[in-house]
């Protein structure tokens, strides 16, 4: 594979090979990352990348779309079946653009949008001041209860009654507990707001029936297709309301996008087909088992898990008990072939560029075939590194780094990723 790249552009070929090596021989614990199947990868690298297809199936602005229409219809129908939805738009290039399309379909610029604070586990597109959502809309942010570190629904209701938002956004990027969508819908109805649920992180769990389906209550559901869904990098919008669906379609095209990425849409179709299988349901169940096992193992080794545990694929780890910052931990673990990301925690006292926590997730480890037994060992490796961080630059004792790195590589060889497959 990649022989033509090797001949044409040796520099990029080297980048691809080095990145393959990093993925193959490293433990990936970033909660938003996963590894696609060879089938998804092949679809993304197909001749479909050559086709312009502005518009929607049977309503294109270009000729020659008869086969890409089939691909997009397959993606839409499979997404609808997977999430029990009446309508699906599979064209958003990303989760951020899925959210933008949903917001533009439901509310005029200057309207009030209420979302979860980024520092409490939300996402940039839920109203962060540096994001389009915080610049185009008036934003009200809710957070977690400082004692329980779970969503404070009383605060959500109080803020909604006070500010009367046009859109309420539920979902997050670093929230490990199951969200009560029924409560959110009741609050939205009370103030006349639309409820948008961003399920980007837990979409795979929803598809497998492990996490409640937000479409039972939300006016609109958005998602990415990577993360727990294990598909290509892209976005998805679902709704059961025909008029909202029409508005979403206009908001995506011609509103914020031109031509859709047909090779990615085909890969989404492959991903949705994989997600409809019994094997995928078993995989999602194992993700949650692994997350619970990893959280418990870290807790048993002296670390604090925000909110006391996890119901999903991810956890937020408070590093204050070890007096290590998220920045130093991310760097130190990276030296040892363990990839994580620094993350703020509720009641954060440090800058987001330094942070007091790390966010961990188990989808990528589970894709390799790892189970609870490996989570115990990985917790050991993580804590060994964290206890040997020398400074804020994340330097680690060389002997410790080599010992951990060697074991990580051994583990990865026991549970290979793409070796022999691509």
UniProtKB/Swiss-Prot annotation:
Q: Which domain of life is it from?
A: Bacteria
Q: Give the family, as the similarity comment puts it.
A: Belongs to the SHMT family.
Kindly indicate whether the keyword Transferase belongs to this entry.
yes
Q: Which Pfam families match?
A: SHMT
Gene behind the chain: glyA
Give the source species. Fervidobacterium nodosum (strain ATCC 35602 / DSM 5306 / Rt17-B1)
Q: Which cysteines are joined by disulfide bonds?
A: none
Q: Its Gene Ontology biological processes?
A: glycine biosynthetic process from serine; tetrahydrofolate interconversion
Q: What is this protein called?
A: Serine hydroxymethyltransferase
Q: What's one GO-annotated cellular component?
A: cytosol
Q: Which NCBIfam families match?
A: PRK00011.1
Pathway it belongs to? Answer: One-carbon metabolism; tetrahydrofolate interconversion; Amino-acid biosynthesis; glycine biosynthesis; glycine from L-serine: step 1/1
């Amino acid at each position: 594979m990649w022989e033509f790249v090797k001949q044409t552009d040796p520099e990029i070929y080297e980048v691809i090979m080095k990145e393959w090596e990093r993925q193959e021989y490293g433990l990936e614990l970033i909660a938003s990352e996963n590894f696609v199947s060879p089938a998804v990868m092949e679809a993304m690298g197909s001749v479909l990348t050559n086709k312009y297809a502005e518009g929607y199936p049977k309503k294109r602005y270009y000729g020659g779309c008869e086969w890409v229409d089939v691909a997009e219809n397959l993606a839409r129908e499979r997404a609808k079946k997977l999430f029990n939805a009446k309508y699906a738009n599979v064209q958003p290039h990303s989760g951020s653009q899925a959210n933008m399309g949903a917001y533009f379909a439901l509310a005029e610029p200057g309207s009030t949008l209420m979302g979860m604070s980024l520092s409490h586990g939300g996402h940039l597109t839920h109203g962060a001041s540096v994001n389009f959502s915080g610049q185009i809309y008036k934003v009200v942010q809710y957070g977690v209860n400082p004692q329980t570190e779970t969503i404070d629904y009383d605060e959500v209701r109080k803020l909604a009654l006070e500010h009367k938002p046009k859109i309420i956004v539920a979902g997050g990027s670093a929230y490990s507990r199951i969200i009560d969508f029924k409560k959110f819908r009741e609050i939205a109805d009370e103030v006349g707001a639309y409820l948008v649920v961003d399920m980007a992180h837990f979409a795979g769990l929803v598809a497998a029936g492990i996490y409640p389906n937000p479409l039972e209550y939300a006016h609109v559901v958005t998602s990415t297709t990577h993360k727990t869904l294990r598909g290509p990098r892209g976005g998805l919008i679902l709704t059961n309301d025909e008029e909202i669906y029409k508005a979403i379609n206009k908001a995506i095209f011609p509103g914020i996008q031109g031509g859709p990425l047909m090779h990615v849409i085909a890969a989404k179709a492959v991903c949705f087909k994989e997600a409809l299988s019994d094997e995928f349901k078993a995989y999602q169940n194992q993700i949650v088992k692994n997350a619970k096992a990893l959280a418990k193992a870290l807790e048993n080794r002296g670390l604090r898990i925000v909110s006391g545990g996890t119901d999903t694929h991810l956890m937020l780890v408070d590093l204050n008990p070890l007096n290590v910052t998220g920045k130093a931990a991310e760097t130190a673990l990276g030296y040892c072939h363990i990839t994580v990301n620094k993350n703020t925690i509720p009641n954060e006292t440090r800058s987001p560029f330094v942070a007091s926590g790390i966010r961990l997730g188990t989808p990528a480890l589970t894709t390799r075939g790892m189970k609870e037994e490996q989570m115990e060992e990985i917790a050991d490796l993580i804590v060994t590194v964290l206890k040997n961080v020398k400074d804020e630059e994340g330097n680690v004792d060389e002997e410790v780094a080599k010992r951990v790195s060697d074991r990580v590589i051994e583990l990865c060889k026991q549970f290979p990723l793409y070796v022999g497959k691509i």
